[in-house]
Amino acid sequence: MFVVLASLFMACGTPKDGYVVKGSLKNAGDGYAVISVADHTGASVIADTAEMSGGKFRFEGKTPFVAACSLRVVPEGKEVLDMLIVLENSPIKLQGDWANLERNTGGSFFIRDMKVTGGKNTEVCNLLDEVYFSTRRLPEFKDYERLEKWFASLDENAELTDEVMRKADTLQEIEDRFRELVFGKQLEIMAAHPSSEAAALYLTPMIDGMKLDEFERVFGLFDEAVRNSEMLTDIREELETRQRLAPGRIAPVFSLAQRDGQMLSLA
């Protein structure tokens, strides 16, 4: 996957049916931007680099399939911004103001009110992301961010007092309710976009909490081409592993060569 993507990222010229990624980040200044992809080991490898001048940068090329990529923006003398983009053969525009750079509770930076527009998969990502942000704004989650910051500030050796345990339990209850609402609404959007690889990728944080039959049902909502796409390899392999290990399922046949050359089959 990486070799194919990297060779196409680095291709000269602008393919008529390829992608153009344009960034316009006010107040970012000069620097550079980097697109990285994961190799077969999961390690992040740089695929292309672009100079940034006055907050503007540009990538162009062609990808043989939709791919989840890491975009890193590195302004001179400023904080570094890392974000995920779904690369597809269409124009993609990123617009924002570096003055709105903020840090989330996990320590990563993001640009508040950043706008990303593009092809089908980018627009589906926007729909799914808006579910997250709109749910966070609901009155019932007004204490969510405060408790997240409190939890992140705790020392690993902090004393587990009754107050600490009470707040931790409250945070867990809020998180469980938040995930329930967000995942439910996102699943509705996924069902409405069966041809979107990006929609299926958003299953990633959900599958740990899914039983096998639900996992099979939800993944089966997507078109066959989507289910077999490169970007969903990890999800597909997780499903196949669960299916093999599920009680009552027919086990795969394994063949083992014996010393006399005969094959021993185990099922």
Residue ranges of model-derived segments:
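Sec-dependent bacterial lipoprotein signal peptides
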Residues: 1-10
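Short, functional N-terminal and low-complexity linear motifs
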Residues: 2, 36-40, 152-155, 167-169, ...
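A non-transmembrane, solvent-exposed segment enriched in polar/low-complexity residues
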Residues: 12-174
